[in-house]
Amino acid sequence: MSLPAPDAPSIYDRLRRTDEELFALFISGKARRELSAVFGAAEYALLAQLARQAQRVKRQRAEAVYLLPGIMGTQLGSTRAAPTPDDLLWLDPQDVIGGGLERLRLPDSAGLRPLGAIPYSYLPLQLRLRAAGYRVIVHEYDWRCDLGEAARALAARLGEESAPSVAIIAHSMGGLIARRAMALAGSERVRCFIALGVPHYGSFGAVQAIRGTYPVVRRLAALDRLHDAEALATRVFSTFPSIHQLLPTRSLSPSADLFDGDQWPRSGPQPIAELLRGARSFTDELPACDARCIAICGTHQRTVVSIRLKDDDFHYEISDEGDGTVPLASAQPGECAKYYVRCEHSELPRSVSVARAIIELLRHGRTTRLAAQRGPALGRHVTVSDLELRSTWNEKIDWAALSPAAHRSYLNRLNQPPPHYAARRARKRQRH
């Protein structure tokens, strides 16, 4: 396998730009070849069109819109002196291949900082909002770290905002940061909070990330020549306070207190006791959503909806009641307004229909573009264990042998459910 020298900038390093610099590149057509290689020709054409539409807007609305990415949704890396590009670690596959994810480990990682939201995930929504006349501020943050600290940083930034009112659009874990920040001084001007697939009561994906059975962890391990999924889980992902703070609360997981390490399997990767204690405190103190919250919930995707411990292994119940990552029961809190869309978790901020609904919600406080009632559940329930999930994606990927299109597909589908989900569901249908 031919790889660049460790210090040689990759194509992902070279294209690590600020949002404004990226917009200018899409408008001008410069770096078209490299951008098309990373985004694909169709995505490049879409982003160029959206950037030109946003450029034509002459007058911005008075309200500021803060966009918060979800977990793993902010690029992380280290800055380098110009003209050398910044060293992008998350998510640069060349670094993953060489075992570089070890640099994410806490608390001993040094020199890493947020380097903007993942462009593929959040540029389309940002540009559509700009084209609608909104001033969009992307609030990047280190998604590994304590969410309470991230909330305080957001509240401080909101307190310095000059706009007369603020709207927050938060995807996934970013919504927990927003909820916490909205109870702190500095957030008084927040008029509305649009929650895109926010795991208000946690996600079982956090359990699987710690156990090394989460799709993202396993697919990254397939690229990593030095670590398997269990090693990545133990040495890297289980060191993040944020992942522990995403564990399901008792309202979502009544059969298991997942903040109690004694209720986890004794074998395999484990949570960290100190982080479990901090996570319990965070979730216990998280303020309830108020009337400013509007939830947009993805539905009808294969999602882990419950868990049980059996024979020293976790067994997960899977149904279509969720967005593939966040169970529907976790995405729709309290009495806030709720809307539903058949969409995968990672596609919520990319969806055209969701973006149009968000713009209507910002303007009018309601929308007709999404369903106000959830559709009927399909009634398909299967179970899968950690043991079964560990049989997936064990073969290493030769990244250099893949085409640019295969590179894009692999990175854009890191959270794709494992084959067991579809196979077991198909067998269940056959039995009926």
Predicted regions and their residues:
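Alpha/beta-hydrolase fold catalytic core
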Residues: 137, 145, 233, 240-315
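N-terminal non-catalytic accessory region
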Residues: 1-233, 237, 316, 322-328, ...
